[in-house]
Amino acid sequence: MKYILSLDQGTTSSRAVIFDKNANIKGFAKKEFKQIYPHPSWVEHDPNEIWGSLLGVMAEALANARTFPNNIEAIGITNQRETTIIWDRNTGHPIYNAIVWQDRRTAQLCDELKSKGKDKIFLQKTGLVLDAYFSGTKIKWILDNVAGARKRAEKGELCFGTIDTWIVWNLTKGKIHITDYSNASRTLLLNIKSLKWDCDLLQILDIPKSLLPELKQSSEVYGKTDASALGTEIIISGIAGDQFAATFGQACLQKGMAKNTYGTGCFVTVNIGKKPIINEQKILTSIAWGRKNSITYVFEGSVFIGGAVIQWLRDNLELFRKSGDAEAVAASVDNNGGIYFVPAFVGLGTPHWDPYARGMIIGLTRSSTKEHITRAALESIALQSFDVLTEMQNSIQEFEIKELRVDGGASKNNLLMQFQADILQCNVVRPKITETTALGSAYLAGLAVGYWESAEEITSLWKSDKIFEPSMEKSKREDLIYNWNKAIKRAKAWI
């Protein structure tokens, strides 16, 4: 039997997932890797450790599936977006650590560019706000701060890539230097209307075009792996940034369909169809995928700290031993005890876009307990997502967001999902397969080689596991939102 192998390279771990034709998981492996924090608000990864982790999980997933590499029809890749790597074109060695999407070191540069009115140019061309979140200013920082980097880049000696590009480069032993439209749309360098690297934006950031990878569809045959990676040559035929892969995996293929991925951060996407809508209200517009020479666009809202707030309570405050314990701890109290937790550890994303906000726990009294704090932390994940969806709905006049499909690790938390439905006042639907990010890239890869025949077949494979319906009293909901908004205002512009 033939399978599709999906490589899901995330912010804190690398996964390999093997799917069959019915979207059943036949093999799975996961490996965490080191988070590097050189300075406050700086976040880095070791690119070589990431590649090593992928080699490990590929072999382990194949072993768990009790199959061999020659039974893999194709490989799909999905990845943490915006995270930036620059490496030597000849040796393949990175010249600096990967600068992670959460990293805020270029916030001041973004402010300087905004003061010159450049943010409006970036918004109209890329659909993005001018923020340290995206790859463009990270590339500039490396070129400006690593000795000799700019000269080498101008000579064509260096390659830039987001994580997908780095994976394909290594899988093919440097033969292929590509990215797909979805990842490219998060760099601040792609014109999402012309579908080309934009020379004006490259000039503003002083980035040589020779650094950049070739642009590709999200579902097409790019080439084959080098035999050294898995012992045989395998077709690589799907690439999408993690949130866009999850949108595809959730079968949100029609205009108006929405999903939220609860991972390290939370990422809400709404399918807006085949034409980009540039939103002035701080909602991002991105390319979700390119397939059959057609582009699908989404609105996206990004919450920087979602499930990571639970990780922080576990590791930094040691309130519980395992992240999975958070639900039981939070459920042991009926409410948050008047506590509101704004986890702005690296600033606030959509719709606030405040890099100078910082984390805050407010409302503490002598009767406050770790249970109240844990519940407030869980609620903060849903409340931040509520802010995003409210802004999106206000920006979309032609259709109503009627349900939210959910995935990611924290979507398994029933207390959180019920609270999300209550706050949103709409159904929250969890699918049977919650590894939707990996599944989406598998679908894109499989469609390119005929493993699956059509988008309609993908839609038919999606199955609901549980529907959470809103049940909270109106007055209680309004109080929670009112106090949350007060807390957000206090956390803003802290530094």
Curated annotation (Swiss-Prot):
Gene Ontology MF annotations: ATP binding; glycerol kinase activity
Any one GO cellular component localisation term in the record: cytosol
Enzyme Commission number, as recorded: 2.7.1.30
Source organism, top-level taxon: Bacteria
Family designation: Belongs to the FGGY kinase family.
Catalytic activity entry: glycerol + ATP = sn-glycerol 3-phosphate + ADP + H(+)
PROSITE patterns the UniProt entry points to: FGGY_KINASES_1, FGGY_KINASES_2
Record field: transmembrane: none
Organism name: Borrelia hermsii (strain HS1 / DAH)
Binding site for sn-glycerol 3-phosphate: 11, 81-82, 133, 242
Keyword ATP-binding in record: yes
Gene (name only): glpK
Lineage, highest ranks first: Bacteria, Pseudomonadati, Spirochaetota, Spirochaetia, Spirochaetales
GO biological processes: glycerol catabolic process; glycerol metabolic process; glycerol-3-phosphate metabolic process
Keywords annotated in UniProt: ATP-binding, Glycerol metabolism, Kinase, Nucleotide-binding, Transferase
Activity regulation behaviour: Inhibited by fructose 1,6-bisphosphate (FBP).
Residues engaged in binding ATP: 11-13, 264, 307, 311, 409
Protein known as: Glycerol kinase
Residues binding glycerol, per UniProt: 81-82, 133, 242-243
Primary enzyme class: transferase
Role description: Key enzyme in the regulation of glycerol uptake and metabolism. Catalyzes the phosphorylation of glycerol to yield sn-glycerol 3-phosphate.
